Amino acid sequence: MRGKFIVIEGLEGAGKSNAQRIVSETLAAHGIEFITTREPGGTPIAEALRNLWKEGEDGEHTTDKAEVLMIYAARIQLVETVIEPALASGKWVVGDRHNMSSQAYQGGGRGLAELVDEVGSAILGDFEPDFTIYLDIEPSIGLERARGRGALDRIEQLDIDFFHRTRERYVSLVKDNPKAVLINAEPAIEQVSADIQQAVEIFLTSEK
C-alpha cells in the first residue's frame, strides 16, 4: 500500500521542528514506518541549492524570480529521488515544508503568484501532500521566537510586511484546501503539541 505524505507549514518561529517531531512520534506509536524531509533540501543537490539560495555566492543573491526556479529545482529533486520512492515502497513521509511554502512566500510575500502557479504545475503536476498542518502565528511573535534561536537569516530579515502577506496567503490556501488544517501556534508548546497530535490522530482515523 502506498504511503502518505504529511507536510508541516508555517512562518519562521511557528514551531515546525517541534511539529515534525510530534507527527513522527504519533506515527511511530501507531507502528507506521516513515522518513522525514525538509525543503528546500533533503538531498545533496537540493541542500547545495538551499545553501546557494540562502547564502548567495561572492556577495550575489538570487533575484526573486530566480529564487522561485531554484526552490522548485530543489523540490523536484527531493520528490523524485526521495519522497516518491518512499511513498511507493509504503513508507510515510513527514515533510518540513512543501509546495504551499512557495505559494505563500514567493506567491504571497514576493507577489509572484502567477509564476509560482505556472512553475509548480509544470514541475509537480498533480503531486500533492495527503495532509498539511499549517501552524499559524502572528509574524512579530514568530520572528521574536526566531531571534531567540540566534542570528536571523536572509529571509528572516525581510520587512514585517513581507511576512504579513505570506501569512495572509497561507490562511487563504488552507481555507481552500480540504486536506489542510490550521493550528494556532501562539499558545504554550504543550497546547500546540497536543493540538498537532490530535490533528494527526483524526487524519489516521480517516485513513482507516
Swiss-Prot record:
Binding site for ATP: 10-17
Annotated catalysed reactions: dTMP + ATP = dTDP + ADP
One GO CC annotation: cytosol
Keywords from the UniProt entry: ATP-binding, Kinase, Nucleotide biosynthesis, Nucleotide-binding, Transferase
Primary enzyme class: transferase
Superkingdom of the source species: Bacteria
Pfam families: Thymidylate_kin
InterPro entries, alphabetized: P-loop_NTPase, Thymidylate_kin-like_dom, Thymidylate_kin_CS, Thymidylate_kinase
One Gene Ontology term from the biological process aspect of the record: dTTP biosynthetic process
Signal peptide: none
Example GO molecular function: ATP binding
Annotated EC: 2.7.4.9
Residue ranges of coiled coil: none
Family label: Belongs to the thymidylate kinase family.
Function in brief: Phosphorylation of dTMP to form dTDP in both de novo and salvage pathways of dTTP synthesis.
Database matches in NCBIfam families: DTMP_kinase
Name assigned to this protein: Thymidylate kinase
